[in-house]
């Protein structure tokens, strides 16, 4: 059983990332800790004027094979694995001295292989062998040994040594052990994922398959959640080991109640939708569907237009902006409606001051970032569906006019706006829009024509005029009924993928009603 506190008398330091190394080494030497080290780490410590003993001197074997073999030795691993109260006699017989602290980080395999021009040879040379072996030895023996794998751990480690007269607690040794095993698992997963994706080992810079033969995923828990999608379900939020800049997982919560499972799911839908717009935009989401989207001169204009689409559904919604939220807009929102979550890349001080009057409102800050998720995944029974993320945009030059009447410039602008929104609406998705704002949204229906009717109904309930609006459909119309319903509501132009067996009938219907229609050749199903 581990003693509560154990002294640190001997430490082995071997790091690729030398951040904080000298300060750590100096603090250990000040506590009369003997330092062992290897290669470049030993040189850095020695150059700082600190005493250090090379591992080669300890083992009697030089580093060999270009550094591939330097710590794989019983005098090293015995010093890490030796058990207090069990192995002292064996250690004494073979001249093995205990090592109480291991400070080690691994060859930078992840950063090297992240480079587009990384060769297979470079990748292989950055696979650490001795490092993970030592980490596992030290972490296994947490009853007697402490192990640090990250410069971010040094401050706490030194603070505990200071507070406990050069000793480390069992609780900290165990926590550091868990972190070390996690790091080894992450490292091995990165190697496995890279090699599994190599399509041809004969290529110098190998082509990598987007869907390797095996996937090893690592996620870090951000927080426990009050419950899952429903109160009888438990839940937690995890983020990628290396989150993409600008995505939801990089958020900072500035105020408000703890986030729920549904808050995060809705926030992701709102943020991904709003960040695709260049002009100031507001997206209001309810149950992962946009219920109001608009572009304006400023945040306030965009909010007023987005809210007007569906004031009823906006109640208790998630609001996202792609600009710094100003105080006037924050006041207008919080005075008018109940809000679950506010999201923006930043906030004026006055906006945050006013938000404190509604202390339960969750306020999230997500810094701008150009990064996009590369993949989408979905769990099914004992399996995982994986696909490239739907990051496909659309430009005017890609549209095909298929009707007798071509859309006007104003209609084209609205068609592209509606198309962007439809991408984030659950299928079957229909979006009515005019002047860069939504007029009505029909979401999640099993029949496309019913989604079209719901969009018209929503517009009517909000007292918005459909006449002169455009319609976007996330997938093709299998029959002409959706076009007939849209025309009856006052729609003037349509954007859809095309590709139906009855495209001819659908185009004829549009011509009969005098509608302009364009095909994108791209579908945006969302389930």
Curated annotation (Swiss-Prot):
UniProt GO cellular component terms: cytosol
UniProt xrefs under InterPro entries: AICAR_Tfase_dup_dom_sf, Cytidine_deaminase-like, MGS-like_dom, MGS-like_dom_sf, PurH-like
PROSITE patterns xrefs: MGS (PS51855)
GO molecular function terms listed in the Swiss-Prot or TrEMBL record: IMP cyclohydrolase activity; phosphoribosylaminoimidazolecarboxamide formyltransferase activity
Domain MGS-like: 1-149
Keywords: Hydrolase, Multifunctional enzyme, Purine biosynthesis, Transferase
Gene3D superfamilies in alphabetical order: 3.40.140.20, Methylglyoxal synthase-like domain
Catalytic activity: (6R)-10-formyltetrahydrofolate + 5-amino-1-(5-phospho-beta-D-ribosyl)imidazole-4-carboxamide = 5-formamido-1-(5-phospho-D-ribosyl)imidazole-4-carboxamide + (6S)-5,6,7,8-tetrahydrofolate; IMP + H2O = 5-formamido-1-(5-phospho-D-ribosyl)imidazole-4-carboxamide
Enzyme Commission number, as recorded: 2.1.2.3, 3.5.4.10
GO biological process: 'de novo' IMP biosynthetic process
Pathway in which this enzyme or protein is active: Purine metabolism; IMP biosynthesis via de novo pathway; 5-formamido-1-(5-phospho-D-ribosyl)imidazole-4-carboxamide from 5-amino-1-(5-phospho-D-ribosyl)imidazole-4-carboxamide (10-formyl THF route): step 1/1; Purine metabolism; IMP biosynthesis via de novo pathway; IMP from 5-formamido-1-(5-phospho-D-ribosyl)imidazole-4-carboxamide: step 1/1
Highest taxon, organism lineage: Bacteria
Domain characteristics, as noted in the entry: The IMP cyclohydrolase activity resides in the N-terminal region.
Family note: Belongs to the PurH family.
UniProt name for this protein: Bifunctional purine biosynthesis protein PurH
């Amino acid at each position: 059983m581990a003693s509560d506190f154990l002294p640190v008398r001997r430490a082995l330091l071997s790091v690729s990332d030398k951040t904080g190394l000298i300060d750590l080494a100096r603090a250990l030497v000040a506590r009369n800790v003997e330092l062992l080290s290897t290669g470049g780490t030993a040189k850095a410590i020695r150059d700082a004027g600190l005493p250090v003993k090379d591992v080669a001197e300890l083992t009697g074997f030089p580093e060999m094979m270009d550094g591939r073999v330097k710590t794989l030795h019983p005098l090293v691993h015995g010093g890490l694995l030796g058990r207090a109260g069990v192995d002292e006699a064996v250690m004494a017989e073979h001249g093995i001295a205990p090592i109480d602290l291991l400070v080690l980080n691994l060859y930078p395999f992840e950063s090297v292989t992240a480079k587009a021009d990384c060769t297979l040879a470079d990748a292989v040379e950055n696979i650490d062998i001795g490092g993970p072996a030592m980490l596992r030895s030290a972490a296994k023996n947490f009853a007697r040994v402490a192990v640090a794998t990250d410069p971010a751990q040094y401050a706490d480690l030194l603070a505990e040594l200071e507070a406990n007269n050069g000793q480390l607690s069992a609780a900290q040794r165990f926590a550091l052990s868990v972190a070390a095993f996690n790091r080894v698992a992450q490292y091995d997963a990165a190697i496995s994922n890279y090699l599994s994706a190599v399509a041809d080992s004969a290529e110098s810079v190998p082509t990598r398959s987007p869907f390797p033969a095996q996937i090893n995923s690592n996620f870090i828990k951000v927080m426990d959640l009050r419950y899952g999608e429903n109160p009888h379900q438990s839940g937690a939020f995890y983020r990628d080991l290396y989150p993409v800049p600008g995505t939801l997982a990089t958020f900072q919560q500035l105020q408000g109640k703890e986030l729920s499972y549904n808050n995060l799911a809705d926030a992701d839908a709102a943020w991904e939708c709003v960040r695709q717009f260049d002009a100031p935009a507001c997206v209001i989401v309810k149950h992962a569907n946009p219920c109001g989207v608009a572009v304006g001169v400023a945040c306030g204009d965009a909010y007023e237009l987005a809210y007007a689409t569906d004031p009823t559904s906006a109640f208790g919604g998630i609001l996202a902006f792609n600009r710094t939220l100003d105080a006037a807009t924050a006041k207008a929102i919080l005075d008018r409606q109940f809000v679950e979550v506010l999201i923006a890349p930043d906030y004026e001080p006055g906006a945050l001051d006013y938000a404190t009057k509604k202390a339960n409102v969750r306020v999230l800050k997500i810094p701008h970032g150009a990064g996009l998720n590369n993949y989408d995944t979905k769990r099914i029974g004992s399996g995982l569906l994986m696909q490239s993320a739907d990051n496909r945009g659309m430009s005017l030059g890609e549209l095909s006019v298929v009707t007798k009447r071509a859309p006007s410039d104003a209609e084209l602008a609205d068609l592209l706006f509606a198309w962007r929104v439809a991408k984030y609406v659950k299928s079957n998705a229909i979006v009515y829009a005019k002047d860069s704002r939504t007029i009505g949204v029909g979401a999640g229906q099993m029949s496309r024509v019913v989604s079209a009717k719901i969009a018209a109904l929503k517009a009517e309930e909000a007292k918005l005029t459909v006449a002169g609006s455009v319609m976007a459909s996330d997938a093709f119309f299998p029959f002409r009924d959706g076009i007939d319903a849209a025309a009856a509501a006052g729609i003037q132009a349509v954007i859809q993928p095309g590709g139906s067996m009855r495209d001819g009938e659908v185009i004829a219907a549009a011509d009969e009603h005098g509608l302009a229609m364009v095909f994108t050749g791209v579908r945006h199903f969302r389930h």
